[in-house]
Structure formats: C-alpha cells, structure tokens
UniProtKB/Swiss-Prot annotation:
Degraded in a proteasome-independent fashion in the absence of viral infection but in a proteasome-dependent fashion following exposure to restriction sensitive virus. Can form homodimers and homotrimers. In addition to lower-order dimerization, also exhibits a higher-order multimerization and both low- and high-order multimerizations are essential for its restriction activity. Interacts with BTBD1 and BTBD2. Interacts with PSMC4, PSMC5, PSMD7 and HSPA8/HSC70. Interacts (via B30.2/SPRY domain) with HSPA1A/B. Interacts with PSMC2, MAP3K7/TAK1, TAB2 and TAB3. Interacts with SQSTM1. Interacts with TRIM6 and TRIM34. Interacts with ULK1 (phosphorylated form), GABARAP, GABARAPL1, GABARAPL2, MAP1LC3A, MAP1LC3C and BECN1. Residues 280-494 form the B30.2/SPRY domain. Zn(2+) binds at residues 96, 99, 118, 124. This is Tripartite motif-containing protein 5. SUPFAM superfamilies: B-box zinc-binding domain (SSF57845), Concanavalin A-like lectins/glucanases (SSF49899), RING/U-box (SSF57850). Gene3D superfamilies: 2.60.120.920, Classic Zinc Finger, Zinc/RING finger domain, C3HC4 (zinc finger). Pathway: Protein modification; protein ubiquitination. The gene is TRIM5. Belongs to the TRIM/RBCC family. The modification Phosphoserine is found at residue 86. Pfam families: SPRY, zf-B_box, zf-RING_UBOX. It catalyses: S-ubiquitinyl-[E2 ubiquitin-conjugating enzyme]-L-cysteine + [acceptor protein]-L-lysine = [E2 ubiquitin-conjugating enzyme]-L-cysteine + N(6)-ubiquitinyl-[acceptor protein]-L-lysine. Residues 186-199 are annotated as: Required for interaction with GABARAP and for autophagy.
Length: 494
C-alpha cells in the first residue's frame, strides 16, 4: 500500500518532458509544472516553429513572465528522494503487505510476487509458483525487448506528430495563396462579381476549416499517443532500474498493455482530391450579366390562366402550377399532359418573365401562339412542340436532358421526289454547365426573337429563337409535364 502511494506521488512530481523528478520546478498559469531547463528549451522550440509559447501538455498559450517557481513541489521532490533512499522503505517492499512474510515466490497465474502464506491460501491454491530468482531473468529480457520496441515507437510517433504539424502549416500556406488568387481574379469586376467571390471564398474557408479541424484533432491524437507511450516507457524504466520486486509486481499486465500498443497514423489529405478553383470567364460573365440586366428592364406582370383542372393545379395567387394525377385514372397508362397559358396577350413590344423550376425532373416553357383547348400533347413524342405549330419552347426531360424544339426537318421522298415529307421535331440538345433553377424568357415581338436565360448562372444565354413569325397574339406557356413539383412565376423583387 505504501509503495503504491509512493508511486502515485512520484507520478505527480515527474516532469512531463524529461520524465524525471522535477528539478527547479516552474509552474504555468494552466497548472502544469516542468523542470526549469525543460520548459526553457521548449520555449525556444515553440517560438521557432509556431511563433508563440504554449504549454506542451494542454497547448494553452502564456507569457514568459508568468512562469513561477514552485517551492512546494520542490520540497515534495526532496522528501520523496529521502523516502525512496530509505532502507526501511525497501524493507517494506520486500515483505508481504498481508502476512508480513518475505516475498520469495512468483505466481504465474496472477503475475504477482507472493509469500509462502499467500501460496497456501485459497486465493492461490493450485496456481503455479516459482522462486523469484528463476523468473526474474526471463522477464528482464522481455521487458528489455519491450523497452527497445517502445523507444522505437516513440521515435515513430514523434515523427508522425512532426509530419502532421508540417502538413498543417503547408495547408495554411496553400489555402492562403488560394484566397489571394481568388480575390485577384475578382478585383476588376468587384461590383458585378461580389456574389461569386463571396461564394468561392466561403467554400474555400469551409474547406480550410474542415481540413485544419481534422488536422488539429489528428495532432491532438498524436500528442496523446506519444504521451501514453512515454508513460509506459517510464514504467518500464522504473521497473528495470528498481528492485526485483518492483520488476515483477504486475509484470504480466504491463506486458499485455505493451503488446496492445499500436501506433495510429494520422489522416492525411491529398492535393489531388482537393476542389480546385477555376477562374470564371470574367468577360463572358460581364457580357451575360449586362444582357440579363438589359432585358430585365422589360419585366412583365404575368399570371396563369386555369385550364384542364383534372391534370394541372394552379395556386390561389395564379403564379404557380403543378401536375396532378387525374382523379379518374384510365386503365391504360396516361401518356398525355396539358400546359397552361400566361395571362399576358402579346401583340407588340418587349416582354420578360422568369420561372422557378427548382428540383423538377421535367418541364417545358416558352411562348405559345395558338391554343387548342382539346389538344393533348404526347409526353413521349412532342410532335406539336414546333414553331410552325406556334410553340417556341425549351424543356427538361428525364431529369438531365435539356432541349430546344425546332421545326421538323423536311426531306424528299426517295420514291417520289416531288413529295416533301417531314420527320419529327428537331430536338436541339442544350448543354448546361450549371443547371438552371430559374429560367428567364425574353420576347422581342418586333425583332421576332425569343431568348432564354439561365438566371442561376449569371444570365448566360441558354437558347434563342430567331426569325419567328408572329401573325397573331402570343402568350407565355408553361407545362409542368408529369412531374408533380411546381413551376413558379417569379417577381422582380425575388
């Protein structure tokens, strides 16, 4: 019992850096204490690598003038040295705490040194026991090998810890350089590109925060790993430098703990997997933004005209439409859907409106020049969506197929050259760098053009119909297809 107390006291007055009893102890504000020589050497290393002084254990920063000599700890160390050198204390360690007899036997099952009375007790009955001299040499060798192994692991752990710190510093430099590059790219177009710059910087800062947070955690793990190894090494050295009794007391448990020690390597982050910043086409973005700003001056007030309530549902404010499965479903799978018109009848001038199509798998929108209330538009074969039939529209099909619908291509019959035959509508694939959540439609009646803009992507032009023939009023057109998510007319303030 007394021996255990001495061990506990020794651990409390051991320097965490050199793992020896404290010499001229100095205490920090955080409460940790170190040898004067050890903490002074640590000051120089911390200032050189990190530019600040921090506690080697808890990393709390502190000014050098706050180092305080700890006389109380120094006195405890001196008293402990006297007790450890006392022959009476050594005598106590060599005798059984329960029976007072000499500890001459080693119990293999319990891994402890016992006396002859312990051997005959019910607790150790049937156990294999040996003289301590017989097993001391065997465990001496095992512990020596374990000590060498742990020293090597300590070196490896310290190397891993240093690698993490080096990688952390490297990441900070790289991300800071990226910040500088991003801000330089947006400098000339600051007024227009503030939103883009802010978005890029937020993503980069999020990446920096995520990576550095993991690296800081990884560094903490490596520090704890190194400290645990140091504790084991200190225990091994104490056993090897102490008496035979100290060597063998609980030796099997120590060996088992050592055998379970496995170095955990820190997580690293590969440059190749980083999100690489690509500077946008600033000139193109500026031009697109100017065009979008120009056409938005002609923003028109548009609402939706209810039509075919069995297939579409229009909101009370008449600015949102969605597909509704018919109440009376036919036995045959429905392949038709209906669109709705906007309230604006256009016979002249310039007009602009925007439609929110966020998250929809399918939609068709644009301008309609003829409206047949009983017409059914086939979802799978949109033959009617052609300018010659009065439809200048673009759409999304199957989640990611963006298309514009042009007039059918005419060709001559092979058997009868005098007869002209039309194929299905010419479906023009549209390739989107950024999928539009919001589409702008601009109609210039006198110029006979209809333009579609990707408002989500700074107003880049999606598609433009030219040479349109308007011999009648035209209307905004909206079709939610068979996707039940809504299409919503946007207001200028939104």
């Amino acid at each position: 019992m007394a021996s255990r107390i001495l061990v506990n006291i020794k651990e409390e007055v051991t320097c965490p850096i050199c793992l020896e009893l404290l010499t001229e102890p100095l205490s920090l504000d955080c409460g940790h204490s170190f040898c004067q020589a050890c903490i002074t050497a640590n000051h120089k290393e911390s200032t050189l690598h990190q530019g600040e002084r921090s506690c080697p254990l808890c990393r709390m920063s502190y000014p050098s003038e706050n180092l305080r000599p700890n006389r109380h700890l120094a006195n405890i160390v001196e008293r402990l040295k006297e007790v450890m050198l006392s022959p009476e204390e050594g005598q106590k360690v060599d005798h059984c705490a329960r029976h007072g007899e000499k500890l001459l036997l080693f119990c293999q099952q319990d891994g402890n040194v016992i006396c002859w009375l312990c051997e005959r007790s019910q607790e150790h009955r049937g156990h294999h026991t040996f003289l301590v001299e017989e097993v001391a040499e065997k465990y001496q060798g095992k512990l020596q090998v374990a000590l060498e192994m742990m020293r090597q692991k300590q070196q490896d752990a310290e190397k891993l810890e240093a690698d993490v710190r080096e990688e952390q510093a490297s990441w900070k430099i790289q991300i800071q350089n990226d910040k500088t590059n991003i801000m330089a790219e947006f400098k000339q177009l600051r007024d227009i590109l503030d939103c883009e710059e802010s978005k890029e910087l937020q993503n980069l800062e999020k990446e920096e925060k995520n990576i550095l947070k993991r690296l800081v955690q990884s560094e903490s793990d490596m520090v704890l790993q190194t400290q645990s190894i140091r504790v084991l090494i200190s225990d091994l050295e104490r056993r090897l430098q102490g008496s035979v009794m100290e060597l063998l007391q609980g030796v099997d448990d120590v060996i088992k703990r050592i055998e379970k020690v496995t170095l955990q390597k820190p997580k690293t982050f590969l440059n190749e997997k980083r999100r690489v910043f690509r500077a946008p086409d600033l000139k193109g973005m500026l031009q697109a933004f100017k065009e979008l700003t120009e056409v938005q001056r002609y923003w028109a007030h548009v609402t939706l005209v209810p039509s075919h309530p069995s297939c579409t549902v229009i909101s009370e404010d008449e600015r949102q439409v969605r597909y509704q499965v018919p109440i009376h479903q036919p036995l045959v799978k429905v392949k038709y859907f209906y669109g709705v018109l906007g309230s604006l009848s256009i016979t002249s001038g310039k007009h602009y409106w925007e439609v929110d199509v966020s998250n929809k798998r399918g939609w068709i929108l644009g301008v309609c020049g003829s409206w047949k209330c009983n017409a059914k538009w086939n979802v799978l074969r949109p033959e009617n969506y052609q300018p010659k039939n009065g439809y200048w529209v673009i759409g999304l099909r199957n989640t990611d197929n963006y298309s514009a619908f042009q007039d059918a291509v005419k060709y001559s019959d092979v058997q009868d050259g005098s007869r002209s035959v039309s194929s299905g509508p010419l479906i023009v694939p549209l390739f989107m760098t950024i999928c539009p959540n919001r589409v702008g439609v601009f109609l210039d009646y006198e110029a006979c053009t209809i333009s579609f803009f990707n408002v989500t992507s700074n107003g880049f032009l999606i598609y433009k119909f030219s040479n349109c023939h308007f011999s009648y009023p035209v209307f905004p057109y909206f079709s939610p297809t068979t996707c039940e998510l809504p299409m919503t007319l946007c207001s200028p303030s939104s």
